[in-house]
Amino acid sequence: YLKEHNVEIEDYKNFSKNLKAFSEKDEEVLQISPQANEALYTLASQHTHVIIAPSPVALMKAHKNPTEIAGFRKAMERDGVAMVKFLRWLKDAVKVGEETELSVDEKLYEFRAEQENFKGISFDTIAGYKEHAAIVHYEATPETSIPLKPEGMLLLDSGAQYLDGTTDITRTIVLGPLTEEEKKDYTLVLKGHLQLQNAQFPAGTCGTQLDVLARIAMWK
């Protein structure tokens, strides 16, 4: 199908080399997304005329057809079932005191693997307990994984790939009693989430403009 429409797929590692070769064809015009980095623009513009404009491919991908939308909903429902089973398991398991960041990661994978059309995780799971939750994109390893206790909070950022959709869900799970500081911080973040969730704004408003709503409770 792709060959019939003159589409060629190249190895990603050859991207720079192929871009340079393409740009050296004087008769060619190259369109680059405004989000492209300076290195790509510089490489391409050395030999060819470059147009900076949103990618038509990205726009087509952003417009979902009814089949895709239905698939997303089914994937979300199945992933929701897996998450509910996991949370129920975690509530009992943490009381025993034998679970770690790595073991809950593995258990969540098991619950997802039970679901129809499961193909794998959509990214490496972030299971951060207590201070580890503050590490951006933390990933537990056998060397860093710490045991869970029936206290404090567990940050769980995870997702799955299903044949008909991809999921990404983040939850902050209270495992037991919290300190007063933890309660305050949790409540302030929740207020920010609700402010952003319920915001009404005109078309054309940027995410950076709305970001203040998520932070204003903490600033006060």
Where are these regions (language model features)?
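Active-site neighborhoods and metal-handling regions in enzymes and metal-associated proteins
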Residues: Y1-K220
